[in-house]
A protein has these predicted regions:
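Histidine-bearing beta->alpha loop at or near hydrolase active sites
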Residues: 346-361
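Primarily recognizes the serine-hydrolase "nucleophile elbow" in alpha/beta-hydrolase
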Residues: 126-182
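Short beta-strand element of the alpha/beta-hydrolase
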Residues: 47-57
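N-terminal cap/lid segment of alpha/beta-hydrolase-fold proteins
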Residues: 18-45, 283-292
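Conserved alpha/beta-hydrolase "acid-adjacent" motif
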Residues: 324-330
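Accessory cap/linker subdomain of secreted extracellular hydrolases
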Residues: 160-306
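Short beta-strand/loop motif that positions the catalytic acidic residue
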Residues: 317-319
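Gly/Ser-rich "nucleophile elbow"/oxyanion-hole loop immediately N-terminal to the catalytic nucleophile
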Residues: 43-46, 112-134, 150
Length: 397
């Protein structure tokens, strides 16, 4: 009933019928160095603020800026215009750094609230809704858990919220497996990537890697790679196979060195991993390269990158079931944390049966957001979380 009322009230705004629903201030600079943008409805403002946390931007992208390509849904819908058309104010930040920006990102989002209130002089919003995608989904979840005094609720989409260390291992495992099936094709190794490869990644992929994986003679090796790595794809749809391979290798190439620097050590560890699904698992496990994580990196991840599932304000999550970058298994892992903290009443998850990373339709995003609004307007009563299915849910990837 509350959701129906929320939908009705949001759609009542006359600005929703216009295509010029946003009035954006010139971008500014936050005290910590991040770039911020604030967009207000061209019509009446409902007094609420939506803050957007964007996804990963490679560390070597310059200058620091809000990623414009992440301000639109796959169908071209503008997020600021969609939010403003419903009467909400919209604010976004670049974060103060590119690359791995999780720890700084939480601080930048809190700082952005102060910028909205005091620097832009819009005053204190009635409610502040935090939304984020991909890396921004993790930042959103951490901020909701850690700063309920600032944010009234959050929508975290396609983020690595279940286990950040497992996310790192997902990319690392894919790289060591790729090197096993396609030896000497990629320069460097899974934990040390040459700068020349980073600088020329798109060209190197197009001229060297892509022809190798699309060669009909490589079909069996590609099949084994996908089976062993558990990378999502749609059987028989070549474009999804190539996308899954490209994305996993891209993150290894572009994110590894930056991640090691910011985590204070090397986080990938496959010493005890048993790989299965190849034509010869015994040979694979005997000969695949093994790496050990640095304890300093693991400690940093545990301290600043792992979610707890302890909620005191609502969190709605949204994820495609065949997400090739941030696998869907993050959602049941996070759900286990929520159950263990008796926070189930404050967590609503929406699964989208589709291939692709953050590949949502506007209606799916809007429904998830309206669920969040309804939970904030009328907070659900807490209840003890059922634990009988925890062993099965905790199995993970």
């Amino acid at each position: 009933m509350v959701l129906a009322v929320a939908i009705g009230s949001l759609l009542a705004y006359p600005a929703a019928a216009t295509s010029t629903s946003s009035v954006c201030d010139p971008d500014g600079v936050q005290p910590g160095g991040a770039i911020y943008r604030i967009c207000m409805p061209s019509g009446s403002w409902n007094g609420d603020l939506v803050i957007y946390a964007h996804g990963y931007v490679p560390y070597n992208v310059e200058p620091l800026a809000i990623p414009e390509n992440q301000l639109r849904l796959p169908n071209g819908t503008s997020l600021p215009e969609l939010v403003n058309s419903l009467g909400f104010a919209f604010a976004a930040t670049s974060y103060r750094t590119n690359g791995l920006a999780v720890k700084d990102g939480v601080e930048d989002l809190v700082e952005l609230v102060d910028v909205f209130i005091y620097t832009a002089t819009h005053g204190v919003p009635n409610h502040i809704y935090l939304t984020g995608v991909s890396e921004g989904g993790l930042i959103t979840t951490l901020a909701i858990e850690q700063r309920p005094d600032v944010f009234d609720g959050g929508l975290a989409a396609c983020g690595p919220i279940g286990d950040f260390h497992k996310q790192i291992d997902y990319f690392g495992d894919f790289r060591v497996l790729f090197d096993y099936f396609f030896p000497n094709l990629l320069q460097g190794d899974p934990i040390s990537v040459p700068q020349s490869l980073i600088d020329n990644w798109p060209t190197y992929y197009a001229t060297t890697i892509r022809p190798a994986i699309l060669d009909p003679a490589s079909a069996d090796k590609v099949d084994q790679l996908l089976r062993v790595s558990n990378a999502p794809y749609i059987s028989g749809v070549t474009s999804t196979i190539e996308t899954s391979i490209y994305d996993a290798l891209m993150y290894n190439v572009l994110a590894t060195n930056d991640g090691i620097a910011k985590l204070g050590g090397q986080p990938f560890d496959n010493q005890g991993r048993v790989y299965t699904g190849s034509n010869d698992d015994a040979h694979l496990n005997l000969t695949v390269r093994r790496f050990s994580a640095d304890q300093a990196a693991l400690d940093e991840i545990e301290a600043h990158y792992q979610t707890t599932g302890q909620l005191t304000v609502p969190l709605v999550t949204l994820h495609t079931t065949l997400d090739q970058q941030v696998p869907y298994w993050h959602e049941p892992l996070y759900r286990v944390k929520v159950i263990l903290n008796d926070s189930l009443a404050l967590h609503q998850h929406n699964e989208v049966f589709r291939y692709g990373h953050c590949y949502f339709e506007a209606g799916e995003v809007l429904v998830a957001f309206l669920q969040l609004v309804s939970m904030v307007i009328e907070p659900p009563e807490p209840f003890p979380s059922p634990r009988q299915f925890l062993p099965m849910m905790a199995a993970g990837p």
